Curated annotation (Swiss-Prot):
Entry's localization field: Cytoplasm
GO biological process: protein refolding
Protein keywords: ATP-binding, Chaperone, Cytoplasm, Isomerase, Nucleotide-binding, Plasmid, Stress response
Keyword Mitochondrion applies: no
Catalytic class of the enzyme: isomerase
Protein name: Chaperonin GroEL 3
Function: Together with its co-chaperonin GroES, plays an essential role in assisting protein folding. The GroEL-GroES system forms a nano-cage that allows encapsulation of the non-native substrate proteins and provides a physical environment optimized to promote and accelerate protein folding.
Domain of life per record: Bacteria
Gene Ontology CC entries for this record: cytoplasm
UniProt subunit comment: Forms a cylinder of 14 subunits composed of two heptameric rings stacked back-to-back. Interacts with the co-chaperonin GroES.
EC number per UniProt: 5.6.1.7
Assigned protein family: Belongs to the chaperonin (HSP60) family.
GO molecular-function terms, A-Z: ATP binding; ATP-dependent protein folding chaperone; isomerase activity; unfolded protein binding
Length: 544
């Protein structure tokens, strides 16, 4: 085991604080509508340009091990906030740095760090409750568009596109963001269920121009196992021919002889048919087949259920208004399943999501839920260069996450105003222990940090903005950094999702209060000749 270096007390907190400040300085420049971009070097390809706080935080690794501990703790705040709320990472970083900075000062003059932590926890809890109480529900499409616009740094086109997508697929529907092959950003809404399996043979294609299979009002055979026996299939194939309707086969696989026969029948024009493989793997494959069965009012043909293929009749098959099959995707549009059955299936999946502890299982269940609940919308991001597309994609991802959070918990005035106004929850909140009361004051001061930073990034003195807003009585009044005017934030459409604001403060308070209580730090002794062994590396030149 290698020898360790140990630092204590004020030295430990100072080193932690230097690391926190370095990370904070790199991240905070991106905050607000006039926030700047950060250029990140990549080991391959061109550098990346981003205004996404968590992307910046994830790139930061410091040479000094003790400073790096501080930076990594705050980086964890940004990552956790991003995971839970999908946005607000820069706000969380600024809040955490402010709380730790003020706390470290008070500990250095003799206050008890554990009592300060208690005070911070009390203050944060009071503010979280206040923000939740002040949140207003998002109902209209225009409100959803406002949230998306703010999160996309004032890009109204992005906000409106997200609102349109949510209108089409519902609040629980899947909205994905991918890179387009053109310079335009566009929304493509897939009504119905889409899964990532395409046609088994290009000979099934009915639209040669678009290279896809288009089946109108087809029957859908949902089979759990491989189809290897042509004899067993004959009764259902004959019934399909007599009905005059197309037939879609969804099964684990179709063996060579059977597939060849289906293709020959398709080419001769006797049978409009197509076959695709079942989506998913393992147990999920069976669950997805059951989802398709519910959506199309069909039965899953499984020998486990005592249903043999040769005994299958047309009334056991699913139905849909239209099916589109491309090389890699199958889309079932307007299945015949009744709403009550689909809703019962949705409720069942929601219950499974609540029960599962695995993040992977949860993600897969949510995908199934979204497919059943409302279909899929795809936002294809275009741009003149690859760098522009990636930067825009970051912003749209943020906007999409923020919009989902707004629908979930409602909205509050944006631009740091909600946190500033929530200071009212701390009025009269004190404790018999002076150090606990000082901890509450740390939170009171930190609530001003985001709005100060937004103003600073716009080239305006933050303390003047805060002073003017504190003097005003209108709870919705705030500073519009884009126009550098004081406006009613709700009416101006400058809003934040309550969930994003609450998550940012909760995570920042949690990590920062723990950093304050650090009394010793342990790390490997740096090798001789490394920058750490001669001092603090590049940090000294930055004036800390």
């Amino acid at each position: 085991m290698s020898a360790k270096q140990i630092v204590f007390s004020t030295d430990a907190r100072d080193r932690l604080l230097r690391g926190v400040e370095l990370l904070n300085n790199a991240v905070k420049v991106t905050l607000g509508p006039k926030g700047r971009n950060v250029v990140i070097d990549k080991s391959y390809g061109a550098p990346r340009i981003t205004k996404d706080g968590v992307s910046v935080a994830k790139e930061i690794e410091l040479e000094d091990k003790f400073e790096n501990m501080g930076a990594q703790m705050v980086r964890a705040v940004a990552s956790k906030t991003n995971d839970l709320a999908g946005d607000g990472t820069t706000t969380a970083t600024v809040l955490a740095a402010s709380i730790f900075r003020e706390g470290a000062k008070l500990v250095s003059v003799g206050m008890n760090p554990m009592d300060l932590k208690r005070g911070i926890d009390l203050g944060v809890a009071a503010v979280l409750a206040e923000i939740k109480a002040r949140a207003t529900k998002v109902i209209s499409s225009s409100e959803i568009a406002q949230v998306g616009t703010i999160a996309a740094n004032g890009d109204a086109g992005v906000g409106e596109m997200i609102a349109r997508a949510m209108e089409k697929v519902g609040n629980e529907g899947v909205i994905t963001v991918e890179e387009a092959r053109t310079a335009d950003t566009e929304l493509d809404v897939v009504e119905g269920m889409q899964f990532d399996r395409g046609y088994l043979s290009p000979y099934f294609v009915t639209n040669a121009e678009k290279m896809r299979v288009e089946l109108e009002d087809p029957y859908i055979l949902i089979h759990e196992k491989k189809l290897g026996s042509l004899q067993a299939m004959l009764p259902i194939l004959e019934a399909a021919v007599q009905s005059g309707k197309p037939l879609l086969i969804i099964s684990e696989d179709v063996e060579g002889e059977v597939l060849a026969t289906l293709v020959v029948n398709r080419l001769r024009g006797g049978l409009k048919i197509a076959a695709v493989k079942t989506p998913g793997f393992g147990d999920r494959r069976k669950a997805m087949l059951e989802d398709i069965a519910v959506l199309t009012a069909g039965q899953m043909i499984s020998e486990d259920l005592g249903i043999k293929l040769e005994n299958v009749t047309l009334d056991m098959l699913g139905r849909a208004r239209r099916v589109l099959i491309e090389k890699d995707t199958t889309t079932i549009i307007d299945g015949s399943g009744d709403k009550a059955s689909i809703q019962a299936r949705v409720s069942q999946i929601k219950a499974q999501i609540e029960e599962t502890a695995s993040d992977y299982d949860k993600e897969k269940l949510q995908e199934r839920l979204a497919k059943l609940a409302g279909g899929v919308a795809v936002i294809r991001v275009g741009g003149a260069t690859e760098l522009e597309v990636k930067e825009k994609k970051d912003r749209i991802d943020d906007a999409l996450n923020a919009t989902r959070a707004a629908v979930e918990e409602g909205i509050v005035p944006g631009g740091g105003v909600a946190l500033l106004r929530a200071k009212s929850a701390l009025v009269g909140l004190t404790d018999d222990n002076a150090d606990v009361t000082a901890g509450i004051s740390i939170v009171r001061r930190a609530l001003e940090a985001p709005i100060r930073q937004i103003a600073d990034n716009a080239g305006v003195e933050g303390s003047i903005v805060v002073g003017k807003l504190v003097d005003g009585r209108d709870h919705n009044q705030g500073f519009d950094a884009q126009t550098e005017t004081y406006v009613d934030m709700i009416k101006a459409g400058i809003v934040d999702p309550a969930k994003v604001v609450r998550t940012a403060l909760r995570d920042a308070g949690s990590i920062a209060s723990l950093l304050i209580t650090a009394e010793a730090m342990i790390a490997d002794i740096p090798e001789r000749g490394s920058p750490q062994s001669t001092g603090n590396g590049a940090v000294d030149s930055m004036g800390y």
